[in-house]
Amino acid sequence: MEVAPEQPRWMAHPAVLNAQHPDSHHPGLAHNYMEPAQLLPPDEVDVFFNHLDSQGNPYYANPAHARARVSYSPAHARLTGGQMCRPHLLHSPGLPWLDGGKAALSAAAAHHHNPWTVSPFSKTPLHPSAAGGPGGPLSVYPGAGGGSGGGSGSSVASLTPTAAHSGSHLFGFPPTPPKEVSPDPSTTGAASPASSSAGGSAARGEDKDGVKYQVSLTESMKMESGSPLRPGLATMGTQPATHHPIPTYPSYVPAAAHDYSSGLFHPGGFLGGPASSFTPKQRSKARSCSEGRECVNCGATATPLWRRDGTGHYLCNACGLYHKMNGQNRPLIKPKRRLSAARRAGTCCANCQTTTTTLWRRNANGDPVCNACGLYYKLHNVNRPLTMKKEGIQTRNRKMSNKSKKSKKGAECFEELSKCMQEKSSPFSAAALAGHMAPVGHLPPFSHSGHILPTPTPIHPSSSLSFGHPHPSSMVTAMG
């Protein structure tokens, strides 16, 4: 299917282009419950176009750029197949959500033929809405169509609620099931004056539906905020609207920004920070569980690891290991230590006749010799001369090797660093994070975007935009 140049092009809608097609307006479409005086000025529609840029749509700095965008060459207006269909931005004929919806559809079909309205790829939106015009963006509010009124005010009427609720699909709300009502063939003809007379009653009915739907949306958000993944959504339904022109819409305030330092980041998760918050609790729990235990072998009440013997009785770590290795209980009485070689009574050196030495050795004949005489004989194969005998035992101070010096110095530096980190607050500590996150808590309410994260800024600034043809990336995004 090819779209002829004379047919409406992409985004060529009177609500978006400041009502350049006055013949497409009809009194039957005047069922919007917002007054024109409450609408935003056209300059603030820039926020909505910034949101559309994150979804693959072209970004326009002001309505003048939007009007200039439609003047691209007819060669670029040929769209093959349904690949450029934007079902969540363009209206679909199968939306029997409201009583006045069929009249709006019939009036739109009679005055403005748009091939998008019969696209087989269109699908129902997440929230009920009435069409503000053929191919116009769907409004999240029931009956918040932007077809009535002239100028850019009507475009804001339909664009602002859409931008406010565009990210609500992130919350996982199931769509409201549509009523099993097929479009009445009697109302699909040309629009009649009866549609304009029914506009007032439809507006009153849609006001009630809007209030009911908003209450259900607030309750759904409260139920959603009960989950552990979204603790900051509990205040969404209770915050008064301060920035949005519609007083009944709850503005989004990032309440979870104040809890970043305590709930999202653990103080011990960074280098040099204190131990994690759950370690003292686990230690106290382990100590409380181990209280009252006693080793059945040695009677010890404190041990790094409690073990059990074959009968299930508690053993300390030492007794348990001894029993495991030797197969018998660990002896309670320490064996007498063997007398050291230096303190052997009655032993004297066969060479120098000394009785004190650090180590007793034996010569080739098997006679005991002192350490000095034994080493001398081992090195020179001659007995040590008696002139070298000294009364005191000479010990030398061994020089530390470079490896041992480096290892010792590294250990000392690490200890000093850990002490400094514990004394002073780390830059990654909870206090520092709270200080950095403090400006986040004072952000203005997100009244134009329902995303949890702020909308990313466009890659190209608005001043350098070229209005020749849309970027291929937006076309690829449109397929999804």
From Swiss-Prot:
GO terms for cellular component: cytoplasm; nucleoplasm; nucleus; transcription regulator complex. Changing T354M: In IMD21 and MDS. There is a cross-link at K389 (Glycyl lysine isopeptide (Lys-Gly) (interchain with G-Cter in SUMO2)). Residues 143-153 have a biased composition (Gly residues). One of its GO terms (biological process) is neuron maturation. GO terms for molecular function: C2H2 zinc finger domain binding; chromatin binding; DNA-binding transcription activator activity, RNA polymerase II-specific; DNA-binding transcription factor activity; DNA-binding transcription factor activity, RNA polymerase II-specific; RNA polymerase II cis-regulatory region sequence-specific DNA binding; RNA polymerase II-specific DNA-binding transcription factor binding; sequence-specific double-stranded DNA binding. Keywords: Activator, Disease variant, DNA-binding, Isopeptide bond, Metal-binding, Methylation, Nucleus, Phagocytosis, Phosphoprotein, Repeat, Transcription, Transcription regulation, Ubl conjugation, Zinc, Zinc-finger. InterPro entries: TF_GATA-2/3 (IPR016374), Transcription_factor_GATA (IPR039355), Znf_GATA (IPR000679), Znf_NHR/GATA (IPR013088). The keyword Heme does not apply. A zinc finger (GATA-type) spans 295-319, 349-373. It is found in: Nucleus. Endothelial cells. Residues 119-209, 448-480 are annotated as: Disordered. Pfam families: GATA. The modification Asymmetric dimethylarginine is found at R86. The modification Phosphoserine is found at S73, S192. Interacts with BRD3. Interacts with AR and CCAR1. Interacts with MDFIC. It is linked to Immunodeficiency 21: An immunodeficiency disease characterized by profoundly decreased or absent monocytes, B-lymphocytes, natural killer lymphocytes, and circulating and tissue dendritic cells, with little or no effect on T-cell numbers. Clinical features of DCML include susceptibility to disseminated non-tuberculous mycobacterial infections, papillomavirus infections, opportunistic fungal infections, and pulmonary alveolar proteinosis. This is Endothelial transcription factor GATA-2. The gene is GATA2.
